[in-house]
Amino acid sequence: MGHTLRPGTPLPRCLHLKLCLLLALAGLHFSSGISQVTKSVKEMAALSCDYNISIDELARMRIYWQKDQQMVLSIISGQVEVWPEYKNRTFPDIINNLSLMILALRLSDKGTYTCVVQKNENGSFRREHLTSVTLSIRADFPVPSITDIGHPDPNVKRIRCSASGGFPEPRLAWMEDGEELNAVNTTVDQDLDTELYSVSSELDFNVTNNHSIVCLIKYGELSVSQIFPWSKPKQEPPIDQLPFWVIIPVSGALVLTAVVLYCLACRHVARWKRTRRNEETVGTERLSPIYLGSAQSSG
């Protein structure tokens, strides 16, 4: 036979315990929600444990940071221990929500990190707090660089496009007017330590035409590109193809120059002849004998 509780009647002890347990589980659920942090390679990440603690409380607490069930860092009785993979680049920020600080991020650092806080009560440690943080690592390729590497033939130029330091594996394509061009010497390399990729490719094109060539690098859902513009060299037209308004002044200038040069030459020749004639006259006068006929007859 069922019983009905009157208003104001206190709940049985078992119901109190059930309610307390439900509230505790609800609190644990909300405190263990997974937050997201996204950073780039070589940057610093701060993963918050979302739990405030004073320096004086450290002696009675145990704090564990682990990644995918593997230990990263622990604080026991105030002593910090860092596991080998994270040494010299990982430390706790105790006064800032027990955050885990990771320097010089690597691709291998991506994953879910869990912070566990245990408190000493009556000689035994029980879990006081639990939270998780998912760390995503981006490795973006920079804008590729395009360099001139020579002329395989007189009318052919070769260029190279390259970029490094990105992830995941890239694909490089040369494009012009929406169509992919035929590349040469395309290489993709991955650094075994950092897992980052490098890519380079070369392209030959005819220098007698204008071009707007695009080097496109796709990696995952992202892409970067660089444009290489080329204008064909300007050639001077033959003289017989010059427009008349250019030919007439040029021809007039040439004729005028020729006339001036001819006049100067004639003037120079005339002056030279006159000088020569004067020199000959002076020489003749010096060589002629003195006439003495009248003097001899008078004797």
UniProtKB/Swiss-Prot annotation:
Spell out the PROSITE patterns in the cross-references: IG_LIKE
A GO BP entry = cellular response to lipopolysaccharide
Q: What does the record list as coiled-coil region(s)?
A: none
Annotated Ig-like C2-type domain residues: 144-225
Please name the GO terms that the record assigns under molecular function. coreceptor activity
Membrane in keyword set: yes
What keywords would UniProt list here? Cell membrane, Disulfide bond, Glycoprotein, Immunoglobulin domain, Membrane, Receptor, Signal, Transmembrane, Transmembrane helix
What is the recorded name of this protein? T-lymphocyte activation antigen CD80
